[in-house]
């Protein structure tokens, strides 16, 4: 189970991990049909293909919405049967280590406990926005390398501090792409300090502070590795964390 706020690179890290250990990765797409019985048949075919492909990684993005739960109504029980079919297959010890499931979600609290339990989702990992200046610099240069950009040597630390830099990985990637476009428009052969500063000052990321904070807190609560949790949360009392999550849900009009 990989959780964390939007823009933290959850899908990317799963794909990179699969490539690093040398197994193919497949992504679940919509296999549902309006005809009764066809959805279950399609899923059975998919599961048989996975058996034949093993070892293989299976990535389910937005897992909380994709998988549903046992209590869905209004489709003659199709969603219930599909959920039970997937849950049973994930828990089958015959395929443990051969078919590795990656459930990716911003809201692990919406996933049924049946899928999150040990034996189905063994590790609950969480990704967060960079918090220290060192983390921000590392992420910045990693994305420069990923995008294969030519960039003038600049003091990134000073630039970040000057512009109160507090963006997600997806925001940083968007800034770099925009800076590349600006450099091209200015006939620069590489991204200059001026291109970068102008782009950062102009960039206004979508801001959903309460939603992001909720996604962060539920990821902290779900994570099974203390080392992966930001230091400010490592010693936080779980009861206080649950209370804060409940308050945010109430603020957003969700059922706690």
Task: For the regions a language model picked out, list residue spans one by one.
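Generic alpha-helical structural context detector
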Residues: 88, 141, 177, 198-201
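Hydrophobic face of alpha-helices
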Residues: 83, 173-176
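C-terminal engagement/docking regions of AAA+ P-loop ATPases
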Residues: 5, 167-173, 186, 190-256
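AAA+ P-loop NTPase nucleotide-binding core of proteostasis motors
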Residues: 69, 102, 112-116, 123-127, ...
């Amino acid at each position: 189970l990989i959780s964390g706020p939007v823009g933290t690179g959850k899908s990317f890290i799963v794909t990179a991990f699969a490539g690093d250990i040398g197994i193919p990765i497949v992504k679940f797409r919509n296999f549902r049909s309006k005809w009764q019985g066809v959805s279950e048949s399609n899923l059975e075919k998919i599961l048989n293909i996975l058996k034949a492909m093993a070892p293989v990684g299976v990535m389910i993005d937005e897992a909380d919405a994709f998988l549903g739960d046992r209590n869905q109504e209004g489709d003659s029980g199709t969603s219930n049967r599909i959920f039970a079919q997937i849950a049973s297959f994930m828990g089958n010890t015959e395929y443990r280590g051969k078919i590795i499931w990656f459930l990716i979600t911003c809201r692990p609290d919406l996933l049924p406990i049946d899928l999150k339990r040990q034996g189905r989702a063994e590790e609950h990992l969480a990704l967060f926005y960079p918090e220290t200046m060192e983390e921000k610099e590392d992420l910045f240069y990693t994305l420069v390398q990923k995008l294969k950009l030519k960039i003038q040597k600049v003091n990134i630390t000073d630039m970040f501090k000057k512009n109160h830099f507090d963006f997600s990985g997806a925001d940083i990637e968007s800034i770099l792409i925009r800076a590349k476009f600006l450099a091209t428009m200015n006939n620069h052969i590489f991204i200059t300090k001026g291109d970068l500063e102008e782009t950062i000052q102009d960039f206004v990321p979508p801001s959903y502070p309460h939603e992001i904070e909720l996604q962060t807190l539920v990821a902290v609560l779900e994570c099974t590795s203390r080392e992966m949790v930001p230091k400010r949360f490592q010693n936080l009392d779980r009861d206080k964390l649950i209370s804060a999550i409940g308050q945010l849900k109430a603020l957003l009009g969700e059922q706690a």
